[in-house]
Amino acid sequence: MPIIRRTSRATASSSKSATSSILRQAILVFTGFLLGALFMVFVPSLYNAAEPSSLHRLMNPIRRNTLSARASSDILKLGNPGPVSDLLERSGYILSYNRRDRLAHWVGEHLTSASLQAGQGVDRDKSNFQEDTDIPEMFRAHLKDYVSSGYDRGHQAPAADDLSSQEAMDETFLLSNMAPQVGVGFNRHYWAYLEGFMRDLTQNFTDVYVYTGPLFLPSAASTGRKNPAYSIEYPFLGATTPNVPVPTHFFKIALTTTASSEYALGAFVLPNQAIDSSTPLTNFKVELEAIEKAAGLVFFDKLDRSKFADLCSKTTCQVR
């Protein structure tokens, strides 16, 4: 399958072969601990989650969606090329769709003990993977993209989260809710355990808001100079042409509430690779700002995040 390589160099480049060799080694030894350290490189010191006003400015820049008469009547009079972010509402989740990558930017869910109750006759075996016809065909992920690719069609909003009706279950099998994931050791194991952990949170918390999405993260490679080079490499799926990129990582964020409106936050980033089931979930715990910086998103901007407790101080963060 096609491979995409993207490199951003802070200094003069080293040889391509050396960089590729180092990159492959880095990917093999990449762990949650190193991931957290890498993320901190991308979090600017001026970004302070304790200042809601700064978050408001990030989410609502001064000129956002504001066009002058000249722009509308002159430069864009023949049309606005985009980008377009399709916001799709389903029975059990909402997603923002990335037309370039044929993946979701994010998928959002609101889990409660009541929402996880199974409706009569709901059966996963009745559901089938489907292309999402709400997405224009040229920007759509196709069933044939995944055939013999070596990757699973990994749910972002899990099927087990949407048991209220067969329709809700079926909607989780739309390809807009999928991303290429390593099967054995990840999608079928550790990632599934993480999904179960999110559902289990409803036993101790009134509401659980979950956001999930893909990430494409670079690795640092030594150049022998003061500043490193950052490189990224990932394959594309596609029956005839490259169509769906394979994320290097995935994030999952949980914001829980109690009856007294106390918030607790947990943010995790996992590499898209087999993970030993004994690996502590806390190895993949990161600061929320790290995900925001990497994904270009801002979460929970209507809340004072300085009041969020650490989820792992309120419950045991572990998968099983």
Curated annotation (Swiss-Prot):
Domain of life (superkingdom): Eukaryota
Pfam families in UniProt: Endonuclease_NS
Enzyme class: hydrolase
Sugar-bearing residue positions: 204
UniProtKB keywords: Disulfide bond, Endonuclease, Glycoprotein, Hydrolase, Magnesium, Manganese, Metal-binding, Nuclease, Secreted, Signal
Gene Ontology biological process terms in this record: apoptotic DNA fragmentation
Description of post-translational modifications: Glycosylated.
Major subcellular location class: secreted
GO cellular component: extracellular region; mitochondrial inner membrane; nucleus
List of residues binding Mg(2+): 187
Function: This enzyme has both RNase and DNase activity.
Family statement drawn from the similarity comment of this UniProt entry: Belongs to the DNA/RNA non-specific endonuclease family.
Misc. remarks from the entry: The active site contains 1 hydrated divalent metal cation that has only 1 direct interaction with the protein; all other interactions are via water molecules.
Self-association and partners: Homodimer; as a result of non-covalent interactions and not through the disulfide linkages between the two monomers.
Name the record gives this protein: Nuclease
Source species: Syncephalastrum racemosum (Filamentous fungus)
Species lineage: Eukaryota, Fungi, Fungi incertae sedis, Mucoromycota, Mucoromycotina
